[in-house]
């Protein structure tokens, strides 16, 4: 056998040597034949298609040439495969690309009819013809198709050729390909088609005009039923299936494509136009979140609030589970705008990041008292949402109640530049101006961000705690990674390290504990009394002018972000994070499986003694409690508010050794806040006791315990008029710790009034600069310089 093969090869070599020109021509022809099929047979643009992680269609965008042409599927459904082969090319699996018998029969019939009545082309030839669209149907073109068809058969399997045909065959109008046709005419995926539906689509490429609703129904029905009969006669379908199939009605009207995640489709089309993207979207969850969005849209539009967005993230993988980029509004209300990526004013949504950064840096402890008093800093006057003051609030309560004044004072202590650098590490893209541009308003909505970046930030923080507690106090170098919506993408979280990325696990955990204390939305106030209630860390935000309502929440497995407002930026009086965004947040969380709370990251915490009243590290004269704090918290300030005072035996008066014998002096530790803080604090805390007055004869030793509440130093005050054009008075206020004692008021060193108990004085001064002096009975005084301006 080997000798015969060797002899045969030798004869070929000898022939080539004798016939060099013929050999060269033959080689050239073979080369042309080999390269006659381009690597990419079809160059048509495709629709952008997105699918859920389960493979369900979420939406599609028309191709650039105006055709609905889906990218080819991995396989052709069995029913359609049988239908198309038995209808178009019964010998498909036997021929080399063309069928001589079918061609001869077609030639005879066409010649007899005097026109083309039968093509005789195989499915392989039809694939070639579809790829060479626009070519005239001549016998010369037919020869080219035959040659190319044989080459196609050599390079591709029969199943691959069927896939090409199914993806590019015309199905009427601008519908191209089986998958699009199954959605357009039957509203289902191609693998869900019945035998009757598959038969309809098998006959359509042969005569696409038959599909127009209400027209040619008899012809289409006849073609379909003949094919079904053939399938029955060939044993492909049984008698019962055949009889049931011929009773199925023909499609009467086209179906709309699913639009389950239209804004995610926009996002995918920007990055991967003309491809099929299998996403990480959970199909059932997406549909239910869409229902929630529709429900609240129908409610909110009655108050002229037309837009909202919802994003659900899996913390462990950073995968997007649900993506609702906007409400189902109409074109007049910017329904096509993807709010998830749109920069909007942050409101209070950045407060947890400041709180966490200060904990992590050892600048405060969870219970550290923060001032909540009238505040003016270089002309900037922050106000709490409820326009009240608490005097002093524990830092964690200031966060959970979203108080603005404590947040501004915290930022002032931490510094705008330092906090800005922290935010840059989180890669909040829209915070892109200088720190000086934002100033202290950075913490109250002076900056912009978007739902995508904020949800990513909280997902990364949550994952930091999870990994740290489950891996013996280790972090990962790439923990702060991007969110992902593509199912085939696997994030790289880097290698283990003992160095934190941005915030330590302890600071994050304590921040989440504070966020978990937030009061639930209206109608759900009793949530904390039920064991089965959701335990999540969440934060709301409302921008200036009620233009943006935010709510972002997280547990150990999921992050949910919600934005509500108008894409135009129009504000509405009732639009707030708590009343508008938070209800959506909790409805979405109710769709998700319950999760356990974050494990405590003990390796990143230290137990210390703190003052029970001030929240600072405890001094010897403080009432003490133990508390877990970040390790740097061991170096924070000690309590500045506890003082040791001396009282007489009745403990009603302060004394000293100059006016009381040492044997009669009682020493006590007393919690003393600065005058303005104390003035507001005592109205919220009936247990707060101001310092006892000095016993008569000891007054000279006391220090001043009064301060201005209003005005602030060097204030510029504008006098306003009422509706009757009368100038409104300015109300001066002073906090004074001595109960039932008098204060004497002077304007420009001229006595004006005496006040007792409530130290307020209305004045209507002239324009210009004035000096206000307040003196108590012991001669202690405070002064303020103000400038009066009339509007």
List where the protein language model places each region.
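Mid-domain, small-residue-enriched loop/turn segments at the edges of structured enzyme/sensor domains
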Residues: 381-384, 415-456, 471-479
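Short, well-structured active-site flanking segments
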Residues: 93-102, 176-179, 239-242, 335-336, ...
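Juxtamembrane regions of bacterial inner-membrane/periplasmic proteins
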Residues: 2-303, 315-321, 326, 373, ...
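Soluble, non-transmembrane domains of envelope/secretory-pathway proteins that act on or interact
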Residues: 17-20, 490-496, 535-791
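Conserved catalytic neighborhood of penicillin-recognizing serine enzymes
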Residues: 112-137, 191, 254-269, 364-419, ...
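A penicillin-recognizing enzyme superfamily signal
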Residues: 279-300, 312-314, 323, 330-342, ...
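Short active-site loop at a secondary-structure junction
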Residues: 68-73, 304-307, 331-353, 366-370, ...
């Amino acid at each position: 056998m080997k000798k015969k093969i060797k002899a045969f090869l030798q004869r070929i070599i000898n022939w080539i040597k004798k016939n060099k020109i013929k050999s060269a021509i033959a080689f050239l022809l073979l080369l042309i034949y080999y390269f006659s099929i381009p690597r990419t047979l079809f160059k048509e643009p495709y629709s952008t298609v997105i699918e859920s992680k389960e493979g369900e269609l979420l939406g599609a965008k028309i191709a650039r040439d105006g055709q609905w042409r889906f990218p080819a599927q991995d396989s052709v459904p069995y029913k359609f495969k049988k239908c198309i082969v038995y209808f178009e090319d019964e010998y498909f699996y036997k021929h080399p690309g063309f069928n001589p018998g079918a061609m001869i029969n077609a030639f005879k019939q066409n010649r007899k009819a005097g026109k083309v009545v039968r093509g005789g082309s195989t499915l392989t030839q039809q694939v070639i013809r579809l790829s060479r669209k626009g070519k005239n149907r001549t016998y010369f073109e037919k020869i080219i198709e035959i040659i190319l068809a044989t080459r196609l058969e050599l390079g591709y399997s029969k199943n691959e050729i069927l896939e090409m045909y199914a993806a590019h065959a015309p199905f009427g109008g601008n519908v191209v390909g089986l998958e699009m046709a199954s959605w357009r005419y039957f509203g289902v995926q191609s693998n869900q088609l019945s035998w009757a539906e598959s038969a309809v689509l098998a006959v359509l490429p042969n005569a696409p005009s038959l599909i127009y609703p209400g027209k040619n129904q008899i012809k289409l029905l006849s073609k379909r039923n003949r094919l079904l009969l053939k399938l029955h006669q060939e044993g492909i379908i049984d008698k019962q299936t055949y009889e049931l199939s011929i009773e199925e009605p023909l499609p009467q009207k086209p179906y709309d494509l699913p639009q389950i995640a239209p804004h995610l489709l926009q996002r995918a089309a920007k990055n991967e136009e003309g491809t099929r993207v299998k996403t990480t979207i959970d199909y059932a969850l997406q549909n239910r979140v869409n229902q929630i969005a529709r429900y609240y849209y129908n409610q909110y539009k009655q108050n002229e609030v037309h837009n909202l967005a919802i994003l659900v993230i899996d913390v462990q993988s950073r995968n997007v589970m649900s993506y609702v980029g906007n409400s189902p509004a109409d074109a007049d209300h910017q329904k096509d705008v993807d709010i998830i990526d749109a920069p909007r004013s942050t409101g209070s949504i950045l407060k947890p990041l400041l709180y966490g950064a200060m904990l992590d840096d050892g600048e405060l402890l969870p219970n550290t008292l923060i001032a909540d008093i009238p505040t003016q800093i270089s002309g900037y006057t922050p106000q709490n949402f409820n326009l009240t003051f608490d005097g002093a609030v524990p830092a964690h309560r200031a966060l959970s109640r979203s108080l603005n004044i404590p947040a501004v004072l915290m930022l002032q202590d931490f510094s705008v530049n330092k906090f800005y650098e922290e935010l840059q590490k989180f890669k909040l893209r829209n915070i892109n101006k200088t720190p000086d541009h934002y100033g202290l308003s950075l913490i109250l909505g002076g900056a912009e961000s978007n739902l995508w970046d904020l949800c990513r930030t909280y997902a990364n923080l949550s994952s930091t705690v999870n990994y740290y507690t489950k891996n013996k106090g280790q972090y990962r170098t790439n923990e702060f990674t991007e969110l992902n919506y593509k199912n085939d993408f696997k994030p790289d979280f880097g290698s283990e390290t003992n160095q934190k990325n941005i915030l330590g696990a302890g600071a994050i955990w304590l921040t989440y504990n504070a966020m978990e204390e937030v009061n639930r939305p209206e109608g759900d106030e009793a949530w904390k009394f039920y064991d089965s209630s959701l335990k999540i860390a969440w934060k709301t935000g409302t921008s200036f002018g009620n233009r943006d309502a935010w709510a972002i929440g997280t547990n150990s497995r999921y992050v949910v972000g919600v934005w509500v407002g108008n894409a135009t930026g129009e504000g509405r009086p009732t639009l707030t994070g708590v009343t508008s965004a938070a209800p959506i947040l909790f409805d979405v969380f109710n769709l998700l499986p319950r999760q356990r709370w974050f494990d405590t990251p003990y390796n990143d915490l230290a137990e210390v003694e703190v003052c029970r009243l001030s929240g600072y590290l405890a001094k010897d004269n403080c009432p003490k409690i133990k508390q877990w704090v970040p390790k740097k918290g061991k170096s924070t300030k000690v309590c500045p508010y506890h003082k040791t005072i001396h009282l007489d035996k009745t403990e009603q008066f302060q004394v000293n050794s100059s006016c009381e014998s040492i044997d009669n002096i009682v020493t006590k530790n007393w919690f003393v806040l600065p005058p303005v803080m104390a003035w507001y604090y005592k109205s919220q805390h009936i247990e707060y006791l101001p310092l006892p007055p000095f016993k008569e004869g000891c007054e000279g030793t006391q220090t001043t315990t009064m301060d201005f509440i209003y005005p602030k130093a060097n204030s510029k005050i504008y006098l306003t008029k009422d509706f009757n054009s009368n100038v409104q008075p300015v109300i001066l206020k002073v906090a004074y710790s001595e109960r039932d004692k008098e204060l004497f008021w002077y304007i420009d060193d001229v006595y004006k009034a005496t006040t007792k108990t409530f130290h307020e004085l209305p004045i209507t001064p002239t324009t210009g600069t004035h000096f206000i002096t307040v003196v108590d009975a012991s001669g202690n005084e405070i002064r303020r310089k103000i400038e009066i301006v009339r509007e």
